[in-house]
Amino acid sequence: LKLLRAPHRSGDGITTIFLSQGEFTQVDSVDDELAEFNWSVYVNRGCRYAFRKVGGRKGKKVILHREIAARMGLDLTNEIDHVDGNGLNNRRNNLRAATTA
């Protein structure tokens, strides 16, 4: 059993969530209750993202930026793009709906 570091809530509206593999992600304070889950890192097309499993080892993969995008009311039938290209920057001003075209 490996314990992850507790999230860091700064006074500037940003919460840092510590992930597996020594990585971290940042979210806005409005989403900081998501820090209560254990998040890990996965790589897709060379970009790192935060995810967690629901329902055990063979359960569903919940991707952090898509969970935040849903809370923002973004259309999840689209891709969710990280404006700055950093898949671990999950602040709301860095997420937008985009097409794959």
Language model: regions and residue ranges:
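Conserved recognition-core residues within compact binding domains
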Residues: 1-80, 84-101
